[in-house]
Swiss-Prot record:
Matching NCBIfam families: thrS
Pfam families in alphabetical order: HGTP_anticodon, TGS, tRNA-synt_2b, tRNA_SAD
InterPro entries, per the entry: aa-tRNA-synt_IIb (IPR002314), aa-tRNA-synth_II (IPR006195), aa-tRNA-synth_II/BPL/LPL (IPR045864), Anticodon-bd (IPR004154), Anticodon-bd_dom_sf (IPR036621), Beta-grasp_dom_sf (IPR012675), TGS (IPR004095), TGS-like (IPR012676)
UniProt-listed SMART domains: tRNA_SAD (SM00863)
GO biological process: threonyl-tRNA aminoacylation
Protein name (record): Threonine--tRNA ligase
The keyword Metal-binding is assigned to this record: yes
Similarity annotation: Belongs to the class-II aminoacyl-tRNA synthetase family.
Annotated binding of Zn(2+), by residue: C337, H388, H518
Function summary: Catalyzes the attachment of threonine to tRNA(Thr) in a two-step reaction: L-threonine is first activated by ATP to form Thr-AMP and then transferred to the acceptor end of tRNA(Thr). Also edits incorrectly charged L-seryl-tRNA(Thr).
Subcellular location: Cytoplasm
Gene symbol of the encoding locus: thrS
Region (Catalytic): 242-541
Residues annotated as domain TGS: 1-61
């Protein structure tokens, strides 16, 4: 008999060789009908795979992230089977699950392919799904695997096999299709009830622009037809909220081919939005004891060699800049933390000085392939709201708790109320990916776990997702459409203080290493703004709106009074514009609604005679007429409410 520990802590005994599906059946038939795979000792397995020793087991369904991923990976295989049946001779690259479904890279040879083919392929996928063919795992020798794909004349699978060791190779078969794959997969194709092919694009084999361009087909599947309908409805709403579309309409940012791909240009309204976000966080940081610092956009290569960033991110960096006479190598700054370490070292530190909190809105640069760039969410130059806290070991937990408070304050003010904290730990089976001693990692991981529990955060733990220098706490925020985004992050780091030989004099008059905390409530400011735009559909809170008011004179003769009102509001830092176009007031109101300006101040003869303004809120609510002084008071009280959370 073997002992199986379930997520609720209960322990059950089973015969050796029990499968996860067998465990599910022992609990209830209803559960078994929904089990897609299982997490066995932290590793995702097929539900049909035998368990031969004491293990912890989590049964995975569609409601689990890993369950969805397995479902979509299996769907990619089913898509490949349909393509092979419809287009004999097709060659296949890779077909992974992604965050929003799956794709398969395909070589159709000389055959032209377009979205016009989607309907026939979808029908074939559903036809094959109804056959309820099992996904069967098989291990064979590398020699036999090479022989199989040589016979099929599939150069891409042979290329993949070249990079694998000479041990056993895993194949998966469903129906008439066999693929090279580690798995895992769902029990059978019958779980797949709805399919939608979303788009087609070109993709170079292995991401190498010198290799052949394959056809990448994106798709998504669901266990119920209604879930597909709901998903497509959300997609339509997402198109309306797309930050690239709204960014252009609201005149926030732009891109220029001459400036370079992935390098956003912030227009006046967008720059004002950024400035307000930065000032909001800067004020909160002052209250929390942070000190501002500023570092250059480039750094000597040796700085990043010392920090370990060059070895880790060198391939993602731009080429070095060489000084013409000294021959030094400089890199565009990929991270702010090495610079902050050097600031710490500018003078001796005592235990009485700690914690020291340095904060900077620092722009960093990473090389991303052109195909990976996407609006503001994936760029080559971005600004981090970076802060680094240098503290004593006994202060780590307290400082971590304070940072959690700051992150949650930011989220609450900006309306992100649905979030999960992801505790990202080191993979104990793959320690070579990380730097540092085991004892330091254990201390850091324990500090994060305890602080998260103390704050009552809803958490998930992910092995292998830690930064190379330490564990971290990432906040996974759900937006208005239910999509998850990784925004704020907090990291404990015992490694950089060692690499930079940071010291402080302790109460024992001896030298000690400080602990370093990395924190960024926004993360990338560009990415945060993109998510915020889509979350609020461009309807920013009053305090954050680039244009907070629009003054709409009914005719030209009221322009002087409109200017007077504008000047009085500007003194109070109330920003906006005067629409003095020769247009009817109805058109001015409609145009202002499209611009999502929170307040419209309409001025006609009555308002001029009474020294007032007629106030209309975005969305159509009429607040009547007010004296300018009364409006200022009302405006300021509205902002105070939004910031007092």
């Amino acid at each position: 008999m073997i002992k199986i520990t379930l997520p609720d802590g209960s322990i059950r005994e089973y015969e050796k060789g029990i499968t996860s599906m067998g465990i599910a059946l022992s609990i209830s038939e209803g559960l078994a009908r929904n089990v897609l795979a299982a997490k066995v000792n932290g590793e995702i397995w097929d539900a049909s795979r035998a368990i031969t020793s004491d293990s912890t087991v989590q049964l995975l369904t569609w409601n689990d992230t890993e369950g969805k991923s397995t479902f979509w990976h299996s769907s990619a295989h089913l898509l490949a089977e349909a393509l092979e049946a419809l287009y004999p001779g097709t060659k296949f690259g890779i077909g992974p699950a992604i965050e929003t479904g799956f794709y398969y890279d395909v070589d159709f040879g000389d055959r032209a392919f377009s979205q016009d083919d989607f309907e026939n392929i979808e029908k074939k996928v559903l036809e094959l799904a109804k056959q309820k063919n099992a996904y069967i795992r098989k291990e064979i020798s590398k020699k036999d695997a090479v022989a199989y794909f040589t016979d099929k004349q599939d150069p891409y699978k042979l290329d993949l096999l070249e990079g694998l060791s000479d041990g056993s190779i895993t194949f998966y078969k469903q129906g008439a299709f066999t693929d090279l794959c580690r798995g895992p997969h769902i029990p059978d194709t019958g779980f797949i009830k709805a399919v939608k092919l979303m788009s087609v694009a070109g993709a170079y084999w292995r991401g190498d622009e010198k290799s052949k361009q394959l056809t990448r087909i994106y798709g998504v599947t669901f266990p119920k037809q209604q879930e597909l309908k709901d998903y497509l409805t959300i997609l339509e709403e997402a198109k309306k909220r797309d930050h690239r579309k709204l960014g252009k309409e609201l005149e926030l940012f732009a891109f220029s081919e001459k400036v370079g791909m992935g390098l956003p240009l912030w227009l006046p309204k967008g720059a004002l939005l950024r400035e307000r976000l930065e000032n909001f966080l800067k004020k909160a940081q002052v209250r929390a004891g942070y000190q501002p610092v500023v570092t250059p956009h480039i750094g000597n290569k040796q700085l990043y060699v010392t920090s370990g960033h060059f070895d880790k991110y060198g391939k993602d960096s731009f080429q070095p800049i060489f000084t013409p006479h000294e021959g030094e190598q400089f890199l565009l700054k990929p991270m702010n933390c090495p610079h902050h370490c050097e600031i710490y070292k500018t003078k001796p530190r005592s235990y009485k000085d700690l914690p020291i909190r340095f904060a900077e809105f620092g722009t960093v640069y990473r090389y991303e392939q052109s195909g990976e760039l996407h609006g503001l969410t994936r760029v080559r130059g971005f600004t981090q709201d970076d802060a680094h806290i240098f503290c004593r070991p006994d202060q780590v937990k307290e400082e971590f708790l304070k940072v959690i408070d700051l992150v949650l304050y930011v989220f609450k003010v900006l309306g992100f109320n649905d979030y999960t904290a992801q505790i990202s730990l080191r993979d104990p089976e793959n320690k070579d990916k990380y730097i540092g001693e085991d004892e330091q990692w254990q201390k850091a991981e324990q500090a994060i776990i305890e602080a998260s529990a103390e704050k009552g955060l809803s958490t998930v733990t992910e092995l292998g997702e830690a930064a190379f220098y330490g564990p971290k706490l990432d906040f996974m925020v759900k937006d208005a459409l239910g999509r998850k985004w990784q925004l704020g992050t907090i990291q404990v780091d015992y490694q950089l203080p060692n690499r930079f030989e940071l010291e402080y004099t302790g109460s024992d008059n001896q030298k000690h290493r400080p602990v370093m905390l990395h924190r960024a409530p926004f993360g990338s400011l560009e990415r945060f703004i993109a998510v915020l735009i889509e979350h609020v559909a461009g309807n920013f809170p009053l305090w954050l709106s680039p244009d907070q008011i629009a003054i709409l004179p009914i005719s030209e003769k009221f322009n002087d009074y409109a200017q007077d009102v504008y000047d009085r509001l500007l003194v109070k830092d109330i920003r906006g514009f005067i629409d003095n176009r020769d247009e009817k007031i109805g058109k001015k109101i409609r145009d202002t609604e499209v611009k999502k300006v929170p307040f419209m101040l309409v001025i006609g003869e009555k308002e001029v005679n009474e020294g007032k303004i007629a106030i209309r809120k975005h969305g159509g609510e009429d607040l009547g007429s007010m004296l300018v002084e009364d409006f200022i008071q009302y405006f300021e009280s509205e902002i105070a409410k939004q910031l007092a959370v």
